[in-house]
Amino acid sequence: MSLSILIAIALFIGVFTYYLWIWSFWMRKGIKGPRGLPFFGIINAFQSYEKPWILRLGDWTKEYGPMYGFTDGVEKTLVVSDPEFVHEVFVKQFDNFYARKQNPLQGDPDKDPRIHLVTSQGHRWKRLRTLASPTFSNKSLRKIFSTVEESVAEMMRHLEKGTAGGKTIDILEYYQEFTMDIIGKIAMGQSGSMMFENPWLDKIRAIFNTRGNIIFIICGIVPFTGSIFRWFFSKVPTAQTVTSLMHTLEIALTKRVEQRAADEKAGIESSGEPQDFIDLFLDVQADTDFLEDETKNGFARSQIVKVDKHLTFDEIIGQLFVFLLAGYDTTALSLSYSSYLLARHPEIQKKLQEEVDRECPDPEVTFDQLSKLKYMECVIKETLRLYPLASIVHNRKCMKSTTVLGMKIEEGTNVQADTWTLHYDPKFWGENANEFKPERWESGDEQAVAKGAYLPFGLGPRICIGMRLAYMEEKMLLAQILKKYSLETTFETHIPLKLVGIATTAPTNVHLKLKPRHSD
């Protein structure tokens, strides 16, 4: 037998043994869970559009209990629905769980120049978070308020036209147009409204509606192929929507940088406050030093080195990209679920309309009035309890072996929160856990909720940075809609909603009727 054949056999045995060892990881630990097949694990379940995998977690929780494990490709994941365990991982032991699980196709979190807040980790994440945080402060949100206000007014015109004569509409499509219009103006350099004419909307919808992405599966099983696919997509941007989007953002950012340089050279001063995220990111500067860890001494123990206190060109593109995707989809879904629940519960809708009429009596809703819409905030919080949106990112990767509540967690293991089970558990929410009850939030004492039991925007230091922007957009549009209309279900409304999705959990459609409150 030739040497080359012996080497091939040895290589095959080595690879097979490696994957078999990963696949049997939880069995060796005596932890139950869905097994799947060697090499694959249950990776195919992550690509099911008709049955969102995040909802499958709840089915498996019922079968295996509040803690179980599975493998998908080379990843090992522990699923938990114990809020104390979740809080320990996401908050108390953040130094040991500061990274997220990610597919190799998403890039190297330590080396990719365009890495963003969702996938970055360690001190690189900390630097990006520190630099990006001012963009989402109340001061910055005031600067883009007028931009959002313009989109609200434009959406109201489209709603009036679309619902004329009592016609039923798929309000999810309208909300997607609304959020895409805002993101286009604040992150893509778009000037003016492009509702129902935006060439990018269908492409972005396709990112969230893609069924069974074989490339993700390949990269999950054979990680080194991720860099190969990324190289190919960088050379042929049109072959992948994500890369094409990055290219569009690069063009918009380049134009803004060149315009700024030309204005400065000509001695032209800025016309006023920044109007979008591109300006805000270009202007951002930190007044603190950052910690970089070149060793494995732990996230919290590092030495200070000189680090750029501005976002780089590529980093700005990365942040604009993730805010484009996250800001478009999640806010549109939250608005859709809120509208659906209000239509299903007219007594709650009436109470909310009374608050809007009382706190926002003038035609225009001001920034300061938004904070007075306390009951609306309760409605949104309760909506996000019943329909958590981006539960797929409610996970943490163990970066240093540790013990959590008596359980040994090895480095490289992912911990995934079963958010839907937590949000519907009667132990934390009472016997009416399945019911839409905004009043449960009226006391304002969220400490009454078990820590780790409510994760609408995540938990701990990596909680969603865009939470304030999402609330602002949703409150502004809902207030205007409820001032003018009452939301009603029709025979076309799916009750209950049919949920689908991969990255987020979305309804197939939300057909509603908007009945004018006042006759003109």
Swiss-Prot record:
Cell division in keyword set: no
Q: Which Pfam families match?
A: p450
Q: Which UniProt keywords apply?
A: Heme, Iron, Metal-binding, Monooxygenase, Oxidoreductase
Q: Where does heme bind?
A: C464
Q: Identify the InterPro entries for this entry.
A: Cyt_P450 (IPR001128), Cyt_P450_CS (IPR017972), Cyt_P450_E_grp-I (IPR002401), Cyt_P450_sf (IPR036396), Cytochrome_P450_3A (IPR050705)
One GO term in the molecular function aspect is: iron ion binding
Entry's family note: Belongs to the cytochrome P450 family.
Query: EC number(s) in its UniProt entry?
Result: 1.14.-.-
Role played: Cytochromes P450 are a group of heme-thiolate monooxygenases. They oxidize a variety of structurally unrelated compounds, including steroids, fatty acids, and xenobiotics.
State the top-level EC class: oxidoreductase
Protein name listed in UniProt: Putative cytochrome P450 CYP13A3
Tell me which PANTHER family the record gives: CYTOCHROME P450 FAMILY 3, FATTY-ACID PEROXYGENASE
Q: Is Flavoprotein one of the keywords UniProt gives this record?
A: no
| Cofactor(s) the protein needs | heme
Task: Give the transmembrane region(s).
Answer: none
